[in-house]
């Protein structure tokens, strides 16, 4: 057992929820990178005071999909996680972004399951097309699989991919494997390069996902103080205009790579940079928040971020 395992799980879960809460106000598409910079400048704390934070799909997924373990007592499979989808998600109400068939990856997969299309076919490129299968949901619902596998990135990646295959395929699965592996590795090291190396070891090196991490890493090595320059590079070479769908995983993977590199192991700075980069702000800050929460532990999470949560979490199923 990893020393202080319960505390690190708690810190990781706090980190995820803090990142989501920080990024949520600027998630809507009209909050461009330029607008966030103009309105908020250098973010150094919450930009909105929530008395209560509503249920969020980025939290629902990691919590409810774990029911597959409770219900079966076995390692997750696409089939067992698909059954958890059907058992615990109420169609059209809360839980996911119910954006419509062929628009929302999760809505499409859910309707596939209801119509008798089993997992993993329900989330496959063959069934839904590449654009839908490679949206960001592949990596944003998998945090708890990493929390379950301390110090074992390979097992975390396997669990995450099994769960993600209900709704995603291709690069979406690489994102699932990467994020879960990073979280698992963060239990045994706080060195960001070691953490990301563990994640990259679980995905094909010829993938776009690995390529964007390498390019961000190379830019950081050449310009270690210029995260905004790195963001401009992402816009030019890996931006939303290059990928189909509402919220593709690759540009947002680039933001996570940037935030992890330039955050340099500091919890607060990592989630702040992820938020200032725009695109899917709550998802990206949530993912890196889990990784850094585990790596830094409770002592590394500033009270100004932790205290407003008051250990309160709202879910919707």
Model-found features: residue ranges?
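Structured, active/binding-site neighborhoods that engage oxygen-rich ligands
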Residues: 1-317
